[in-house]
Amino acid sequence: MKDLRQLASACEAELRAIGIRPGRVAVWKVNSRAKSRWGQCRELSPGCFEISIAARLLQDDTSDQAAKDTIVHELLHTVKGCGGHRGKWAALAAQVNAALPQYTIKRTASAEEKGLTPDPPAGRYLLRCSECGREFPRERQSRLVQHPERYRCGVCGGRLKRVR
């Protein structure tokens, strides 16, 4: 497994080299339970942050760059005024992408973009379009799950069928 602190230090140095001053990160965590996000930045107290990174990004068979993209993404959230993904955060992400071409900082990234195999669709229930084959995983037994015949595929208009 890659050393998160070493990667984070390298990322912070690269940001500082292009004039971006990230906030103070008090806690770096490896999140082994993360399934639907690559990283998370939480403000513990004003100006003090906790960043967690998905364990999948730190595995030996994953590229360093995949992890560093996420680390830089989260470090940008520590800059004052960069809580969301618009405005100042988006401008800083564009600055990083222009100054450091090895980075691709954006709001979201798929497993394929990170060089990982995607997880199979999660969910206790699975519906499938009879026309295009698109799958709709669901965790809750919603009306859609209970009565798929009342609904249509949003892509092609085909009928939905509950698979599991």
Predicted regions and their residues:
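Active-site-proximal or metal-binding-adjacent scaffold patches in catalytic folds
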Residues: M1-D69, T78-R164
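Walker B catalytic acidic pair
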Residues: E74
